[in-house]
């Protein structure tokens, strides 16, 4: 007689479900990450196939480093979009739409992403040596929150530019995402980006806004790596490389805080404290190495996905094996240029509509970071730190950043880089830093199925 499974208590061994159900659950997790993961390369000009490969390999690497204990999927990080838009901004096509990849500068951006992953490794080592509370003292929400807010605001103009190519498709995509997020139930609430793309794409088909020529020309099988796009071959010490480092590496300081929140969310969902076992040092190391690998191969930064945490909460299947099945499926899809060609037929207007709400939510997540941690803005110290960060980020970004020469090498700091440096220094210098790290902060919000950085 087969063992009866009590789903209400959660399933920690998916093998009890049988191979068929495990595969279906893996497909479900793949769809949960899919919309957000493929959106990043569409917004930056990176390869969709390379991105899927890096997401799959990064997830498997993360599971290996965390002793196969943490049921987390690593997909493309939205937080780094601001860095990509500064280092390798999309170029205009013949119609004035920002759809052309900046092939000259993308490898430098990817190389900087690879180095930003090393920041995670340093943080992992410091946490192992000094403990998490001492390290997080330097990166309180009054610093990381405004940085995240700035990222979304810097990206906002590009969303409007993309929407202008087809406002009908943009409004359909935007409206669908809003409806799914506010009124959706179950998987509908967890997959707002994917559903938004599908619904608006259907409208695009009806209105004749989709060009299928590239699909017929694409091969069914191909290698998802492109040497000319790899960050590995852009580590050359050039001014472009150095400037990219200063622009993108500071973003890692903010995404590390999101990582902590995501791991806390998974812990709350599953009922196991992953911050203690296998340890935050291991989860940071796994995320960091996955990001470094992705950058070297020409992909975007990886991050733990809140969408998949929502699937865990909905299905109550907590076995990390199911996540690894989704990772393998992502790798398989990455070897099909035909599939990438289909993704690349998504009209610019749809991308604009999705990014319209996405970029706003990046800033909103920064606000949430500040609110959940009860940052006191009646305290003039906190007001000064936040004010300096916001003005540095937006102000210097509007004038092209700050440039200076050191040892004959010209270095250009973006507004985000200046903001991060100024915020960290002010927080360290000004008296009254009473922040105490709480690993459980934000765990509820991260399981809600909303979009994640």
Residue ranges and their predicted role:
Residues 1-24, 212-232, 268-275, 283, ...:
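Intrinsically disordered, low-complexity non-transmembrane regions of multi-pass membrane transporters
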Residues 1-74, 78-103:
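N-terminal signal-anchor module of multipass membrane proteins
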Residues 20-35, 169-173, 191-192, 223-262, ...:
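Hydrophobic, membrane-embedded alpha-helices of multi-pass small-molecule transporters
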Residues 46-51, 68-81, 135-144, 189-194, ...:
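Short, non-helical or kinked segments that cap or interrupt transmembrane helices
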Residues 105-213, 327-440:
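Membrane-embedded alpha-helical modules
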């Amino acid at each position: 007689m087969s063992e009866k499974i009590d789903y209400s208590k959660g399933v920690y061994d998916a093998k009890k479900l049988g191979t068929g159900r495990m595969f279906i659950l893996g497909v479900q997790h793949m769809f949960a990450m899919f919309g957000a993961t493929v959106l990043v390369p569409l917004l930056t000009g990176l390869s969709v196939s390379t991105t899927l490969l890096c997401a799959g390999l990064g997830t498997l690497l993360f599971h290996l480093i965390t002793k196969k204990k943490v049921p987390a999927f690593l997909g493309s990080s939205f937080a780094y979009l601001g860095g990509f838009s500064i280092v390798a901004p999309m170029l205009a096509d013949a119609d004035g739409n920002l759809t052309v990849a900046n092939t000259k500068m993308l490898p430098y951006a990817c190389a900087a992403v690879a180095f930003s992953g090393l920041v995670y490794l340093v943080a992992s080592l410091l946490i192992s040596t000094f403990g998490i509370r001492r390290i997080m003292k330097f990166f309180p929400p009054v610093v990381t929150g405004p940085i995240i807010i700035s990222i979304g605001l810097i990206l906002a103009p590009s969303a409007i530019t993309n929407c202008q190519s087809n406002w009908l498709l943009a409004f359909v995509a935007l409206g669908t995402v809003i409806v799914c997020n506010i009124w959706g139930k179950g998987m509908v609430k967890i997959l707002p980006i994917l559903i938004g793309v599908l619904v608006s794409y259907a409208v695009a088909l009806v209105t004749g806004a989709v060009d299928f020529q590239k699909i017929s020309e694409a091969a069914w099988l191909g290698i998802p790596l492109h040497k000319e796009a790899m960050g590995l071959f852009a580590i050359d010490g050039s001014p472009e490389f150095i400037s990219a480092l200063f622009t993108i590496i500071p973003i890692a300081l903010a995404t590390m805080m999101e990582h902590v929140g995501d791991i806390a969310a998974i812990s709350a969902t599953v009922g196991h404290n992953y911050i203690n076992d296998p340890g935050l040092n291991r989860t940071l190391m796994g995320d960091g190495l996955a990001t470094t690998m992705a950058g070297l191969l020409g992909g975007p930064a990886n991050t733990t996905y809140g969408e998949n945490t929502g699937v865990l909460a909905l299905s109550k299947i907590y076995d990390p094996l199911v996540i690894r099945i989704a990772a393998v499926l992502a790798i398989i899809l990455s070897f099909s240029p035909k599939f990438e060609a289909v993704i690349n037929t998504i009209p610019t207007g749809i991308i604009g509509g999705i990014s319209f709400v996405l970029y706003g939510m990046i800033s909103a997540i920064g606000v949430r970071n500040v609110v959940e941690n009860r940052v006191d803005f009646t305290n003039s110290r906190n007001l000064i730190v936040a004010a300096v960060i916001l003005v540095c980020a937006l102000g210097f970004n509007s004038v092209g950043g700050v440039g200076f020469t050191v040892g004959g090498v010209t270095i250009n700091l973006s507004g985000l880089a200046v903001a991060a440096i100024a915020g960290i220094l002010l927080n360290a210098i000004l008296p009254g830093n009473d922040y105490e790290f709480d690993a459980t902060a934000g765990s509820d919000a991260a399981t809600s199925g909303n979009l994640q950085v």
